[in-house]
Regions:
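Extended, charged alpha-helical coiled-coil/arm scaffolds that mediate oligomerization and mechanical coupling
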Residues: 146, 156-157
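Long, charge-rich boundary regions
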Residues: 42-86
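Long, low-complexity or tandemly repetitive, helically biased scaffold regions used
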Residues: 103-149
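Peripheral terminal and linker regions in Fe-S/redox and tRNA-modifying enzymes
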Residues: 3-7, 64-65, 88, 92, ...
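Conserved small/polar residues in nucleotide/adenosyl-binding loops
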Residues: 161-163
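N-terminal-proximal low-complexity accessory segments that begin disordered
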Residues: 3-57
């Protein structure tokens, strides 16, 4: 499975009109985003995918998702997809909160019939360890057809319309 680092990139971001040569930023964002923040953002999106898997299972069990979880997901999407916050410390705190939420939802649902990395991943304690794990969460983390990968990114970015 290839990822951003396998491709020799410190980061990979192509979500805005400022991307380098219209192809994506791979060392430092034209917008000022650092590789550190880009990788923490990738891991945050990865985590909310796991939260969403548990949320889906919770709904299937006829239970409700607490509004604070919805607000958290909205906040993460806004923070990561609109490039409004390049503070690594804030992203680390959001990541820690994401793991707490995921653990809480897991406790509410029990084991679910989804064993993807988004669900099974447990966030490490330190930023250094988080950054070591971040490549698996990068945009290029899955060995997918480029069209499918692009469609997934489009759906992710379109989620902001509903916030």
């Amino acid at each position: 499975m290839s990822n951003n680092m396998d491709l020799g990139y410190e980061m990979f971001c192509y979500q805005c009109e400022q991307t380098a040569n219209g192809k994506g930023c791979t060392k430092l964002g034209v917008c000022g985003k650092t590789a550190e923040v880009a990788n923490l953002q990738d891991l945050l999106i990865f985590q909310i995918k796991g939260i969403s898997c548990y949320g889906k299972a919770l709904l299937a069990q006829g239970k409700e998702i607490d509004k604070s979880v919805i607000r958290f997901i909205e906040n993460v999407l806004f923070t990561t997809l609109t490039n409004v916050n390049f503070d690594a410390a804030v992203h680390v705190e959001l990541l820690k909160e994401s793991q707490e939420i995921k653990d809480t939802l897991k406790g509410m649902t029990g084991e679910i019939d989804n064993h993807t990395a988004h669900v099974t991943y447990t966030l490490p304690e330190t930023k250094t360890e988080m950054l070591k794990d971040a490549p698996m969460a990068g945009i290029m983390y899955e060995d997918l057809d480029p069209d499918i990968r692009s469609l997934r990114q489009t759906v992710l970015y379109l989620s902001l319309i509903h916030i």
